[in-house]
A protein has these predicted regions:
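Short, well-ordered coil/turn segments that N-cap beta-strands
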Residues: 8-12, 37-39, 71-77, 139-144, ...
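Conserved, mostly hydrophobic/aromatic
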Residues: 14, 33, 41, 70, ...
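An acidic-aromatic substrate-binding cleft motif
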Residues: 2-25, 30-39
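Short, acidic/polar
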Residues: 20-35, 126-132, 254-265, 335-345, ...
Length: 550
């Protein structure tokens, strides 16, 4: 398996939905795409009802017709499994496939992603449609790769259906073996939370303080379980597609919360595709940080995070116009030159393939305001003119494909601390504050850096490529990670550790030792006392090189 995309040259693509348009438009669309340098189209990620209109009755004639035309026009295709949008008949007949909120209320048909990831019945239907598609469409040479599902964990990354509670118990049984071990690791003696039967265990439900708030150690295990479920869900599809895929790649698009993408890469997915919408930084109800808040660099942060998963990756959805659903999100239109800027920003961070969303703005449905390269009128516009410039750019620098991004600075990150910080009001804000602080400093000084996923599998060679490593938030820190960091420093590497280092163990419990815990010898210090500033207290500063640093 690759873990990096393999393109012979920089390549342009676009997301296309022939099912939304009259057949009379298809050929002209494909020919115009080629005029603008587009060589690859993504298809079918939302077309389950078209391919299985009734249970067990498969009809691939629509896609046979279109793929024949795509092959005739020498257009390459990334074909998708449509499991993000189960058809109405499935959701209605099999309510056990539906997701639920923390209070047990089901999420019904009418939008997308109303399903859960653990229902045996839903996994059965996913397996069937994936297998039928893989076997049927294998004959089309124009298909160069497969996208599994679409944006897993996007609409929601929490699951509370009956099958999720059952699968959570099975996950904990596999992880801890016995109730005695689970009770000890989860500290359930506190507040008389001790479990005496596996059936007493549930995902975090409504409690005296709200929905989704429970034992903090169990909450951390819950997120690990959600990631485990998502990886298993996609791995099932990957294994089926792999049987007939040949040398076609298998990917999925992201990146979203509560999902360990490194484990996903080990489960049968070749590399990750990122969905890049730079104006999300201004449109998702985020507070204004004032002048210099670097919202324009938000995509740089996410692209670097993607590169930690796949050193060379692709963009499956690059923002092409203003965007938003009819009930949320207000993304402004790209300014003149900005579409080109965003495209080159993706390339500069390691993308060898950039696919725009979408070819033409849809004239119906929830995304009528999510504009593509073409407007509703299908007439030439400034975005298409700018695409011509991007085509020329790609031709001029096409040979940089395959060349990895080079950085001497690495920011260590890990899913344990990310997930632990999500509901920890003491440590969560510090994680974002410290990581963002390093990101801002490196960006302002134009210093290339990588995010480095620190995992059990990380070895010394992975770290020694960096002259400087920063671990801004290592609240959860294991002895094994300290040992490899100690080797890195002993071999001449420079390491900066953030505040609250070593505060917790792998289960989120606080060891009976002074901070920084296992890293005390490595850091050469112990922390005797610490505090937050009380409300109204002035900010503390240190003077360094004639500067006041908060």
């Amino acid at each position: 398996m690759r873990h990096s995309i393999e393109m012979e040259k920089l390549t342009l693509g676009v997301c296309y939905y022939p099912e939304h348009w009259d057949r009379a438009l298809w050929k002209d669309d494909l020919q115009r795409m080629k005029q603008y340098g587009i060589e690859v189209i993504r298809l079918a990620e939302f077309s389950w009802a078209l391919m299985e209109p009734e249970e067990g009755k498969y009809d691939f004639s629509f896609w046979d017709e279109f793929l024949a035309l795509a092959a005739e026009e020498n257009m390459k295709v990334v074909f998708c499994t449509p499991t993000a949008t189960p058809p109405a008949w499935l959701s209605e007949k099999y309510p056990e496939t539906l997701n639920a909120d923390g209070d047990g209320n089901l999420m019904y048909h009418g939008m997308r992603c109303q399903h859960n990831l653990t229902s045996p019945k839903y996994l059965e239907f996913c397996e069937k449609i994936t297998r039928r598609m893989a076997e049927h469409f294998n004959k089309y040479d124009c298909i160069i790769g497969w996208q599994l599902d679409n944006e897993v964990n996007c609409e929601t990354n929490e699951y509370y259906s009956k099958s999720d509670h059952e699968a959570f118990r099975a996950f904990l049984k596999e992880r801890f073996g016995t109730l005695d071990n689970l009770n000890e690791k989860m500290g359930t003696i506190f507040w008389s939370q001790t479990y005496t039967d596996w059936d007493q265990i549930h995902l975090a439900r409504r409690s005296t303080v709200g929905t989704g708030i429970a034992n903090p150690h169990m909450q951390l295990e819950q997120v690990r379980f959600i990631s485990h479920s998502a990886v298993h869900y996609l791995a099932l599809q990957a294994s089926i597609v792999r049987e007939t895929a040949g040398d076609r790649f298998i990917t999925t698009n992201g990146i979203f919360g509560n999902l360990d993408y490194q484990k996903l890469m080990e489960s049968g997915v070749d590399f990750i595709m990122y969905d890049s919408y730079p104006n999300f930084a201004y449109a998702m109800d985020r507070p204004d940080g004032g002048e210099g808040d670097l919202k324009d660099r938000n995509s740089s942060f996410n692209l670097a995070r993607t590169r930690a998963i796949s050193p060379l990756f692709g963009i499956m959805e690059q923002q092409a116009g203003p965007g938003g659903w009819n009930f949320r999100i207000h993304q402004a239109s790209p300014k003149p030159g900005q579409l080109r800027l965003w495209t080159m920003q993706s390339v500069a961070h390691g993308a060898d393939f950039v696919s725009f969303f979408r070819w033409r703005t849809c004239s119906f449905g929830t995304e009528i305001y999510w504009h593509g390269l073409n407007d509703y009128s299908n007439r030439p516009n400034r975005r298409l003119e700018e695409l011509s410039l991007v085509k020329a750019d790609f031709e001029a620098i096409k040979d940089i494909a395959g060349h990895p991004y080079e950085a001497a600075v690495g920011i260590l990150c890990d899913y344990d601390n990310e997930w632990d910080g999500q509901k920890d009001v003491w440590h969560g804000p510090l994680r974002n504050f410290s990581t963002d602080g390093w990101f801002r400093s490196l960006q302002k000084k134009h210093i290339p850096f990588d995010f480095v996923d620190f995992r059990e599998e990380t070895n010394l060679k992975d770290l020694e490529k960096y002259e400087l490593l920063v671990y801004p938030h290592a609240a959860i820190l294991t002895k094994e990670r300290v040992e490899i960091l100690t080797q890195y420093v002993a071999n001449g590497g420079k390491l900066v550790m953030g505040c609250r280092t070593g505060y917790k163990d792998i289960y989120g419990r606080c060891p009976m030792q002074p901070m920084p815990g296992e890293a005390a010898e490595l850091c050469g210090v112990t922390v005797e006392d610490f505090t937050f500033l009380a409300p109204g207290e002035p900010m503390e500063y240190v003077n360094w090189n004639k500067k006041r640093i908060p």
